[in-house]
Amino acid sequence: MATAVETHLRTSDFYFKIRLLYKDTGLAINTANADDITVEIINQESQEIIAIKTLSQDSASGYESIILLDPTTDGYIDVPMNKEDFIDSAGTLVDKGMYEYIATVYETDSNFIGGLADFQGFGEAFILA
């Protein structure tokens, strides 16, 4: 059985839902025993899911970037995992100052647990630990 922990980030244009699934190992919740991390980028006005990014943990090397869901093709594509690689429904790249916003939320949002670590999905510092 796994334990899910969710938190939410919002900007004027996008809504980020970060979900971590943890193995029930009796250990404290941290990234070392997380099964996967899923990030959904949602247009707040239309509630359309623009992109989905999933990381899975590799026991030997830690977190590895797996896939970016491209809603325009309903398929999974392999891309370099920088924040500029997120695309919107029109196929254009999305860059909304994610790093600055995420850092601000971390400093002010009590829903965050733990600290910052490298989250390759945005190419910036961001993992719930």
Language-model segments: residues:
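Contiguous segments within soluble domain cores/interaction surfaces
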Residues: M1-A129
